[in-house]
C-alpha cells in the first residue's frame, strides 16, 4: 500500500472547512471513449466487451477479464480468427490502461452526479473539473454544487485533508492495494468513503475504519 502524510495542524472535526472532499483529475467519459477508439491497436468490440464485463463484475481483475473475453469470443470465431486474437494478445493486454481509465471516468462522474442529485455539495481539487461543472449543471441543475479549488501540488494535500470531514475515493482497477487517498484520509482524521477491493476487505473493516 502507499504511504501518506499527516498534517502538522490537527483541526477538530466539527471545525473543518470541507464537509465532502474529492481530489483527483477529471476527464469526460464520452471524450475519453472517443479518443481511445482513435488509438491504433484498439480492438473496439474487445474494448466494449471488457468494459461491460468489468462494470458488471467490479471485483474481477483486468487480467482475468481479458481471458474470459477471449474465451467468450473464441466460441464464435473461426480457427483463423482465433489465431489472429492470440497473435494480437500483447497489444490487447497493453490497452488495459484504457479500460482502467475509462471506467474510472464513468465511476467518478456517476459518484458525483448521485451526490449532487441528493443535494450534497462536494469540494474538489485537481485538474479539469471546470468541465465537469458545466456537465453537472445540465444533468443536475437544481441539486448540490461542486466547489472547485483548482490544482495543487501533492505536498499540500495533508493540510487539505486535515480540513475535511469526509473524503471520497474511486480505486484504480487493481485488487491487491489501495490508492493513497485512503491512508491520507485516515491519517488526517477523515471519514473515508471508497469502493472496495480484495486488499481493503482483507485489511480494513467496513463501518469501523472505512465505509464501502
Regions found by a protein language model. Give the residues of each.
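A conserved nucleotide-sugar
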Residues: 45-66, 77-80, 87-92, 105, ...
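A general structural signal for short secondary-structure junctions and capping/turn motifs
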Residues: 10-14, 107, 112-116, 158-160
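Active-site rim elements
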Residues: 96-105
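Catalytic binding pocket for nucleotide-activated donors in carbohydrate/polymer assembly enzymes
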Residues: 102, 116, 124-212
Amino acid at each position: 500500500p502507499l504511504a501518506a502524510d499527516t498534517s502538522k495542524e490537527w483541526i477538530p472535526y466539527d471545525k473543518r472547512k470541507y464537509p465532502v472532499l474529492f481530489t483527483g483529475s477529471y476527464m469526460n467519459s464520452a471524450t475519453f471513449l472517443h479518443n481511445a477508439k482513435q488509438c491504433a491497436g484498439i480492438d473496439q468490440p474487445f474494448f466494449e466487451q471488457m468494459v461491460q464485463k468489468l462494470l458488471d463484475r467490479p471485483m474481477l481483475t483486468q487480467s482475468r477479464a481479458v481471458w474470459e473475453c477471449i474465451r467468450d469470443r473464441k466460441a464464435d470465431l473461426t480457427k483463423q480468427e482465433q489465431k489472429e486474437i492470440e497473435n494480437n494478445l500483447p497489444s490487447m493486454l497493453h490497452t488495459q490502461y484504457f479500460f482502467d481509465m475509462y471506467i474510472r471516468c464513468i465511476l467518478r462522474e456517476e459518484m458525483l452526479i448521485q451526490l449532487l442529485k441528493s443535494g450534497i455539495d462536494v469540494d474538489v481539487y485537481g485538474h479539469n473539473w471546470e468541465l465537469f461543472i458545466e456537465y453537472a449543471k445540465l444533468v443536475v441543475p437544481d441539486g448540490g454544487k461542486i466547489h472547485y479549488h483548482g490544482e495543487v501540488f501533492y505536498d499540500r494535500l495533508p493540510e487539505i485533508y486535515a480540513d475535511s470531514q469526509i473524503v471520497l475515493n474511486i480505486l484504480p482497477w487493481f485488487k491487491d492495494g489501495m490508492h493513497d487517498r485512503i491512508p491520507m484520509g485516515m491519517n488526517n482524521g477523515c471519514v473515508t468513503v471508497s469502493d472496495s477491493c480484495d486488499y481493503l476487505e482483507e485489511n480494513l473493516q467496513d463501518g469501523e475504519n472505512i465505509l464501502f
